[in-house]
Amino acid sequence: MAQDCREKIISNNYIDFVLDFPLEEIFGDEGGRYDYCYQQVDSRIGILSINRNQLPDTSLLSNDYMSFPDILGLQQVGEETNEVRGEVFNPSPLIQSGITQVQDARLNLTGRGVILAFADTGINYRNRIFRNADGSTRILAIWDQTVQEGEPPEGFLYGTEYTKEEIDRALQTESGIIGNGSTTTAGIQNVRALDIVPSIDENGHGTRLVSLAGGSRLGEGSVYNSPAFQADIVVVKLKPAKEYLREYYQIPDGVSAYSSTDVMMAVKYLDSFAKVFRRPVVFCLGMGTNFRDHESGGAFSRYLNSIASKRSRIMVITGGNEGNASHHYRGRFPEGNGRGENGDRNVASEESMEVYVSEGVDGFLMEVWTEAPVNLAVSIRTPGGEYIDPTSVLFQTNLRYRFVFEETVITVYNAYITQGSGDALVLMRFENPTPGIWTIGVSDENRVADARFDAWLPISEFLQQPVYFLRPNPDTTMTTPAYVPDAITTATYNSFDNSIYQESGRGFSRDERIKPDIAAPGVDLTIAGNRLGEEPVISTYTGASLAAAMMAGAAAQFAQWAVVDGNAPYIRSQEVKNYFIRGASRDRNIDYPNEIWGWGRLDLYNTFVEMER
């Protein structure tokens, strides 16, 4: 059954759904008639992979969109190349964040006894930056979801798990060290580390995050240093999203994209190390999406919050790179919303969104969210002037529009009441959009006074060429799942001049909860964690995911003080967040909390200073 299930989980012929109710509610007593696999995430949430030929209609929009997996992209700037740059490590961001100050003999916070956990593109485990002084690995395990030839972790159905013992054996083989400690070149010419542990990080993003948060200290910190350089490491290399999901979300070729189903299973696996090793675990998520409600109402966000709320778990999530992308629109219908002088309600007020589409865009999605009892209707005007009258889509159905003079096809789907939040969603899927300015009119058929709606376009990584609102709103531009309530959500700033990173995602959440929580450095960071070879090569990188890694490293230092050293053994993400808020650096001329900085800049040293007051 496990092998059979493995094929279903990885095959593009099986469509995945995220369920937050028992499987029996779908199949009843007829489950045996269906070709499917089911993975239990927790007591409420499960993942169904079902043969697409057994669905009544394989057009995805005919099914419940809210059960589709989210698709997430990496929150970095640029891709790593094979070029070796060999720059000099700059400790300034660590000092600015109060990280190196607590590594001294008085507190000696180095991440000792803490597990740093990552779900990302993998790790270059052969790099010296992830080894102890004796050459052994600091990695407790790697679950590579992309390798199907080995055994998956216990209780999981796909991928291959590599233990610390296997990784050490691979490293010893590559260095020519035999089991008895002698060294030779004979007998190892045809055996490499990758023959034993064939897990690599082709992208480099995951390797950089781990190195930044917990890479080994070199040269007593002068050659390289990280916040939690003595923490243990667990990594999940996520498998790429299935092709049907990429096609549905219209992800460009060559762009990394991952399904929330695999991220949830990764987090479940990483969480198990807290139980097995009885140690605190710090999770770092450096990816996100613009889809979903920007409130944490979906099953994915709810699951992450359930993990973040456990004792000895600390969840850190990036706020994303969408703050300056012009991908968010906020509209508000005027007070009265179409009422005439006599109070009649014949015509609803319409708010027009203008979306610019560049040449070379094959397609994109746009989501429009509002609160009940607003009943959204949309009109469409093409760049060529063709017009579709305001139409209210029926509950969980879709309308498909074609045009006379333009080749664009638009499908409009309505979830009148969505799962989780209960809010209303209109999803618009553009195929082969005509370049130019599209005008989308939005009105409320129920004419709720002073009603508001929000619309989002995909993250920049998921667009071939620019697509953006001409009158955007920069707020509420953090990527999902940054809105998870108990997680520590990071804004990104430049620690060299204390300015906010221009692309840093902004809050608050759509329901006005305070997010982001704390800003961390993420601009021009020198990181030793190249994806190739054994020797660390220091290079400079920028991006919101790096701010999350810096915060995760600091959280691991704090977890050592709290849990390992016994000062607050039952601590959770929310309490760690509050400690960090108390110690955050704040400017006198700025009001806090705010949508850009949250509660201020990370200052781990000042967190402990505040405890003494």
Residue ranges and their predicted role:
Residues 210-213, 221-222, 234-242, 271-281, ...:
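Hydrolase catalytic cores
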Residues 143-152, 156, 161, 165-176, ...:
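Extracellular S/T/G-rich loop segment that most often corresponds to the catalytic His/Ser-adjacent loop
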Residues 282-283, 300-340, 601-609:
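Catalytic cores of secreted or luminal carbohydrate-active enzymes
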Residues 361-364, 430-446:
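Noncatalytic modules at the cell exterior or secretory-pathway interfaces
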Residues 71-72, 238, 267-295, 318-319, ...:
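Short acidic, glycine-rich surface-loop motifs adjacent to enzyme active sites
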Residues 423, 447-460:
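Edge beta-strands of jelly-roll/beta-sandwich modules across compartments, strongly enriched
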Residues 1-115, 121-138, 436, 476-480, ...:
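Autoinhibitory propeptides
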Residues 103-259, 361-362, 373-374, 484-486, ...:
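Subtilisin-like serine protease catalytic core
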